[in-house]
Amino acid sequence: MHNAKRFLIAILLLTAQLTFAQSGERRLLTLDDMHRFHDVRDPQISPDGNWVAYTVSSVDLTADKNDTDVWMVSWDGTQDQRLTTSPEAENAPRWSPDGRYLSFLSSRPGKAKGNQVWLLDRAGGEAQQLTDVKGKIASAEWAPDSRHLVLVMADRDTDEPDDEKPPDAGPGGSPPKAPKPIVIDRYHFKQDVVGYLTHPPGRLYLFDVETKKAEALTSDKLEAAAPKWSPDGKFIAFLGEEIKEGKDVDRYNTWNVYVIEAHAGATPRMVTHYDGVHAAASRSRVDWSPDGKLLAYLQSSAAKLEAYNMNRLAIVPASGGEPRVLTEKFNRGVSAPHFSTDGSTIFFLVADDRSEYPASIPASGGDVTRIIKGLGAISTMDEGKDSRRVVLAASDTAPAELYALEQGSLRRLTHHNDALMAQLKLGATEEFSCTAKDGTDVHGLLVKPPDYVAGQKYPMLLRIHGGPNGQDQHSFSFERQLFAANGYVVIAVNYRGSSGRGEKYGTAIAGDWGNKEVVDLEAAVDHVLSMGVVDPDHLGVGGWSYGGILTDAMIAKDHRFKAATSGAGTAFPIALYGVDQYIMQYNEEIGPPWKVGLDPWIKISYPFLHADQIKTPTLFLGGEKDFNVPLVGGEQMYQALRSLDVPTQLIIYPGQNHGITRPSYQTDRMQRYLAWYAKYLKGEEKPVPPTATAAAK
């Protein structure tokens, strides 16, 4: 059945390609294309350097979910093989150093609940489940001897229900027992997707491949993440956060580099003693020099301003000693450090102005060297035998694919989106710069409709990125291109607070949200208007997360916008104190209201407190279970505009967190964007999806 289905899909794709080839005409991007793209990630070079394992995510429209499979491409790019076909996702492929196995993590049905390690034998055969543990495996890394793995795993909460077992029913088939109350005693007690933080911390476990036994390396007094084996296999370096009796670890969020001997009963040794953040564990890794003497890691630039952190590359002796920051004067954030095979150089990725690229620096210190020129976004890099390097690269007109990086040039390895991209006619992306009224230099991107006609003025959409510590860059954006295909000029602006422009630019908005950013965004709109390409009477704005927050600020302060879409935002932050996951940021940047008074909170709540100034028809959206920026932020603004008789609507996505992940809801959201903008900027009525109740239509 599955083979027949795959064959039919292949025939349909081939027919579509042949039809396109015969017509020779490219078409505009449509909403139906949204889930036809494939998301390529996580390249891992094999020990012999001849293969690259990686993952490909695609959408199963029938099941209404995303599916991720493991693939493998040859170094010369001539062979590309899909290795897994399970309906459950497979992630984090890792080669055993002897090249015999390729492991991955998956929650496939098996002996134990949740993510487990599975093995593919290179000699052939189906994947076999390796681990059978009751904890939650976050990562698994091979030891140099190929006989052990280090697991990052949170012990199973004994109060947590087992989803694989039916709920216990009482005598005579009575209803199942009610779940136990949730007991909260942590300072930072909520996290989006995770939920209420009652689970034990992540710990390191040493797993024996032959005996299939896992032994604890670290205790529950140390949160551990991002482990890396030493070249000789005797030690493991990792990022850790100490949990002391009487010390509320959540108030400090201080991660340091640790080293532990790779055997049960060993005591972790703290290598660094930094009163700040060595990059959040999810964004960093520690790397050993080939001789085992040095460790490379990421150190934050602002110890108390993690939200605007610009990571710096640092090294420290593995035995302990004074760290040395190698990129202290570079003034750009870096990520993913790793030593060259000879140990003389450290490679890393740089977040620069509207781009991301690989670079290097001598391990002894010196100047940063950019490895590849041009506009684009290189977001991942791995190095293998004979200094072979593979990167994940994207551009304005090409989704991310794998490339071999050879002598400063890219050689294509994968082609998962080629057939679709060959059909499409895309809008041109241009850079622009402007000056805000306070003299700040502001940069952005502008996308024109594919059939743009010089001299004609188009409706404009200002689409605001979230973060704020992120940026719009030269990578493929389905959203920008879809809006352009629907006849809009789209602008994306890296306002103050964005990454890619240095530490001062990134931290400029700390404790002062929704003010300088608005100045920058207004300057960009003014600049694009002066170019003569947009109609000043047909301006729209929108964004998600911090982009939604700034959308609320824009429509409260700038009355030129005729339509807005505000997703997962808030305009009254004090109402989210203790309700969302940002308690540390509130206290560090603004201060508790009983300590600093209401004035600083009032300043950042302008849109809600001046909602009567808003005339822009606005669509609010959010996830029902968002703990990042809870739905209450959108509900309050919706209620305010509804009370003021300003055209508005609130869309709630059931069961969704901050990021909308269900494919049908992603389509729904984009369809509503298009319909809202078309109605208020073009005077067109476009169909919208059915809603849960007639009142919501």
State what each model feature region is:
Residues D67-T68, A154-E210, D248-Y258, S300, ...:
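Predominantly five- to eight-bladed beta-propeller fold
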